[in-house]
């Protein structure tokens, strides 16, 4: 069945443009409340990032949920994975996150977690969509839901993060720079690492509702690179606006992406005989990662891009580790979804165990040159299906002679076509990527 509102990662868009409007959020809250209270009264958690629009949408969702007879537990600004965790621990029927992840402040969105802290099954999302398009009715006054605020949510999540490493863990002597993207991790992430003994320098932790992800965070690491070098830090950690992506910077200022972090965690788990199965990556994962894991006899498979597909593949195979080069990393022995703080903890712990620097670990394997170009498009036409684009892809693939990969895909969250070319010659790879991007741009014009 075709989805009307839900995309690959919930509902997302520009604030004030349908469906990211207060009236829609009211109806969405009501529809979700009706869907989850099939068995009677229910409790639903709401968390959000630091966007100014989050407060407006929180109120609208709360009103809709209450009208459907659902009690609401308000967490305030809290990382997306924290909402998943707290939904489980409070035995709530569902959790709702108000966030547009790494997008600018003028975007916002909604994603749901089931009572188990996992992404909602497709059938539940479709049920909510059907209810949105039905007339809204309010339960009897005695059945209206109540709202309350969970004041110790941050402390609960901090302790949960720390529980993902041994109680003997001591990061004393380690100097870190943490970039919170002016987002949902700004209170909890520095506390986690400080309480484990690290010296922490914090940037990107002054949210004003408008500066989330603005030249900071996992998609804009320039300030972190500069701060790491200036402060003589051992490494830097950058989170995105909602705390489900992480990138790192070594002491020289070099960026360490999700593929490289996955390799560090995977090999550490293997050495400690705690790696169940192999590693799930995506179509965008660097070919070098696959080859490096193969050299360590660690199985590797690719899922479609998007953490929900990575998690689905992990569950299908019974594996405990997966992620994306963008920094979504899922450590299933600890969490039910991608958790940037917990992934960062596993990396730092692995470095301490091995007595290695992040720079040394970064050089442990060779990344194949990979060029990614985003091309914006509009309208309903699929540029990837255009004959000119297909012909250009076939031409590039043939010229690579089996020594690389070509991938074109539409973003699940933005009107973008992502053009990716990977191979063993950086100049050739860039030229071919630009050639393909030019064709896609012409088709989209």
Curated annotation (Swiss-Prot):
Positions where Phosphoserine occurs in the chain: 101
Residues bound to Mg(2+): 101, 240, 242, 244
One of the GO BP terms on file: carbohydrate metabolic process
Superkingdom of the organism of origin: Bacteria
SUPFAM superfamilies: Phosphoglucomutase, C-terminal domain, Phosphoglucomutase, first 3 domains
Family note: Belongs to the phosphohexose mutase family.
Name by which UniProt lists this protein: Phosphoglucosamine mutase
């Amino acid at each position: 069945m075709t989805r009307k509102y839900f995309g690959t990662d919930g509902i997302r868009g520009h604030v004030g443009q349908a469906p990211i409007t207060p009236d829609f959020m009211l109806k969405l809250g009501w529809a979700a409340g009706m869907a989850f209270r099939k068995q009677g009264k229910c409790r639903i958690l709401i968390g959000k990032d630091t966007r100014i629009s989050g407060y407006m949408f929180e109120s609208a969702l709360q009103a809709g949920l209450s009208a459907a007879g659902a009690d609401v537990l308000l967490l305030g600004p809290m990382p997306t994975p924290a909402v998943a965790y707290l939904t489980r621990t409070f035995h709530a029927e569902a959790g709702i996150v108000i966030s547009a992840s790494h997008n600018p402040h003028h975007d916002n969105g909604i994603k749901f977690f089931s009572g188990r802290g996992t992404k909602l099954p497709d059938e539940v999302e479709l049920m909510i969509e059907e209810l949105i398009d039905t007339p809204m009715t309010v339960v009897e006054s005695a059945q209206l839901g109540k709202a309350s605020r969970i004041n110790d949510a941050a402390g609960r999540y901090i302790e949960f993060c720390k529980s993902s490493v041994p109680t003997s863990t001591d990061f004393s002597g380690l100097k870190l720079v943490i970039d919170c993207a002016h987002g949902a991790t700004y209170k909890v992430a520095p506390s986690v690492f400080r309480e484990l003994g690290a010296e922490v320098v914090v940037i990107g932790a002054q949210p004003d509702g408008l500066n989330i992800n603005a030249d900071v965070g996992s998609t804009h690491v320039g300030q972190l690179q500069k701060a790491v070098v200036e402060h003589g830090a051992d490494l830097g950690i950058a989170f995105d606006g909602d705390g489900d992506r992480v990138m790192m910077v070594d002491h020289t200022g070099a960026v360490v992406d999700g593929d490289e972090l996955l390799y560090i965690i995977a090999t550490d788990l293997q050495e400690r005989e705690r790696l169940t199965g192999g590693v799930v990556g995506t179509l965008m994962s660097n070919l070098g990662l696959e080859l490096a894991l193969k050299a360590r006899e660690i199985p590797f498979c690719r899922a479609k891009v998007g953490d929900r597909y990575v998690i689905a593949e992990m569950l299908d195979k019974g594996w405990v580790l997966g992620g994306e080069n963008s920094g979504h990393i899922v450590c299933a022995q600890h969490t039910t979804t991608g958790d940037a703080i917990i992934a960062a903890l596993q990396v730092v712990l692995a470095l301490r165990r091995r007595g290695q620097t992040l720079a040394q670990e970064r050089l442990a394997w060779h990344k194949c040159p990979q060029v990614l170009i985003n091309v914006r498009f509009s309208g309903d036409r699929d540029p990837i299906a255009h004959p000119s684009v297909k012909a250009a892809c076939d031409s590039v693939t043939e010229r690579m002679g089996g020594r690389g990969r070509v991938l074109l895909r539409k973003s699940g969250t933005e009107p973008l076509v992502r053009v990716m070319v990977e191979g063993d010659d950086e100049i050739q790879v860039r030229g071919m990527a630009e050639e393909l991007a030019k064709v896609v741009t012409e088709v989209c014009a």
